[in-house]
Amino acid sequence: MAVVKKDNENAVEALRFPFVEGSILIAVDTLIYVETDRHRNLFHTADRTYSIYRKLDEIERQLDGLGFVRIHRSFLVNMRYIRRISSYICYLNTGEQISVPKPRYPYVKKQFELFLSNAGEAEDVKEMEA
């Protein structure tokens, strides 16, 4: 996996994965979610879906600290695309809904709240710099 960093920032902009379709660089902010389907994982972006034969646990480690949360044993979601979480359902900006299991619900909700508060702080810093 190759990592590409943004200029003058520590944030990762894109990651290269060995998909079935070939080695492809995926911009982190375009990856909506990763879903397990049998023995492969599907990377859903706005444009298309890519498949890879790799454990979701491995993918989760690679995306750690980049705004993704494991909401289900089969789903890893980019929190930038979560509109809201309520009544054990994760509502995405794309209109899709993913069930959140009852035991994971408090963890997922807390991670999303932390993400929102950190995103708010980042926006405050940008406004102060302008």
Q: What are these model-predicted stretches?
A:
Residues 1-9, 121-130:
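N-terminal regulatory/sensing modules of transcriptional regulators
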Residues 5-6, 55, 102, 109-110, ...:
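Context-gated lysine
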Residues 92-110, 114:
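C-terminal structural segments of small proteins and small subunits
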Residues 107-125, 129:
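C-terminal output/interaction extensions
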